UniProtKB/Swiss-Prot annotation:
It comes from Archaeoglobus fulgidus (strain ATCC 49558 / DSM 4304 / JCM 9628 / NBRC 100126 / VC-16). Transmembrane segments: none annotated. Keywords: ATP-binding, DNA replication, Nucleotide-binding. Involved in regulation of DNA replication. GO terms for biological process: DNA replication. GO terms for molecular function: ATP binding; ATP hydrolysis activity. ATP binds at residues 73-77, 209, 221. This is ORC1-type DNA replication protein 2. The keyword Cytoplasm does not apply.
């Protein structure tokens, strides 16, 4: 009996990780800023971006481009991938600006100043005009300005920034182009006609990933990020399912990493489905909170009303909204479009009296969304 007990303990111990062991082969592949050597299912978009940037690599002006598509469709990844490869080949000069971090024109112009001149921008007492005059006066090679998530800018700010860049070739004789990215496909239509008249660009569209594409992308991350055989097949299928339901590859990547960390914390040599469920319960809250930061107070108010009840017709919901907030139907409709684009709600058709009626409902657990709103 004593021998059997010792054998049982030894067998169990072999299934446990020691303190200096890890399941992760390359943990960096799960980082938000990681760009793989191969981007799956975006060959067409990469080719279009390369065609826009190629003139700059030949000492000519880049072609303007607008990358449009829902969140988590590869816009940022393809842009940064092409920039990385172009910089390796020719030392392309570019200024990459992630708008949520630079929401004001002066901050955007300061970033361009820093990237072009290789030094910190002067104190904020210097006007934007003087700041950009120094940039354009010292620019002696083609420049590409990337405005990622430009839809986070207010319309007036976007017009001011775009106009400053677009007028530079005529006023200073410089070679400069713009690559902008937005989750709102209608954003280009919101620009001032005066800006739009001079902002000619190639539209590059990014459709949502399908189930098989999400599975393929996440499979590559598992192969490169974990040691072979570590991630259980059932656990992986669950991650793919949750990522597909959220329509967000990034969420799947978050879950892969979090599930691996959960398995390590309990000393397991295998990532199991229970690790994914624990990760999902914890990560969904922070993931949703991050999405909610893209909403203003009115948009959050509408979202709260949607999540406070079961499926409701868009007409009935509008009446509820107007009882609390003064809002035109056009603005209300645009808010619903944005919430759907961010994958926070679902809009479907159903029968109600004559014809078809649109119904709206939340995609996530109402309690989780409520808690996420309290975090921001």
């Amino acid at each position: 009996m004593q021998v059997k007990r010792i054998i049982h303990i030894n067998v169990s111990f072999t299934l446990m990780l020691s303190w200096d062991e890890t399941l992760f082969k390359n943990p960096e592949v799960f980082d938000p800023d990681y760009i793989p050597d191969e981007l799956l299912f975006r060959d067409g978009q990469i080719r279009q971006l390369v065609s826009c940037i190629k003139p700059a690599m030949l000492n000519s002006s880049p072609i303007n481009a607008f990358c449009l598509g829902p969140p988590s469709t590869g816009k940022t990844s393809t842009i940064r991938y092409v920039l990385r490869e172009a910089e390796r080949e020719t030392g392309l000069l570019y200024s990459y600006i992630r708008i949520p971090r630079f929401k004001e024109p002066y901050k955007v112009f300061s970033k361009i100043f820093q990237d072009v001149l290789g030094q910190q921008s002067p104190p904020s007492g210097i006007s934007k005009t003087v700041l950009m005059d120094r940039v354009w006066s010292n620019l002696d090679e083609p420049l590409l300005v990337v405005l990622d998530d430009i839809n986070f800018l207010g319309k007036n700010y976007a017009n001011e920034i775009l106009y400053e860049i677009l007028k530079a070739p005529d006023e200073y004789g410089v070679k400069v182009g713009i690559v902008a990215a937005a989750t709102d496909v209608k954003f280009p239509l919101l620009l001032d006609p005066f800006v739009g008249a001079s902002f000619h660009y190639m539209e590059i569209h990014y459709p949502s990933y399908g189930y098989a594409e999400i599975e393929g992308i996440l499979r590559k991350r598992v192969e490169h990020g974990f040691y072979e055989g570590v991630f259980d097949d059932g656990a992986f299928r669950r991650v793919v399912e949750l990522a597909y339901r959220a329509s967000d590859v990034r969420y799947g990547i978050y879950l892969l990493k979090a599930a691996g960390m959960n398995a390590e914390s309990r000393g397991s040599r295998k990532v199991e489905e229970r690790d994914v469920e624990v990760a999902h319960a914890g990560e969904s809250l922070s993931f949703i909170a991050k999405i909610l930061t893209a909403l203003n107070s009115e948009e959050r108010a509408v979202l709260r009303m949607i999540y406070s009840q079961n499926a409701i017709s868009t007409g009935d919901l509008y009446e509820q909204v107007c009882s609390e907030i003064k809002m035109s139907y056009r603005k209300y409709y645009n808010i619903l479009e944005k919430l759907e684009r961010l994958k926070l709600i679902e809009i479907s058709f159903g029968e109600k009296g004559r014809g078809k009626t649109r119904y709206v409902q939340g995609k996530y657990d109402a309690e989780v969304v409520d808690r996420a709103m309290q975090l921001i």
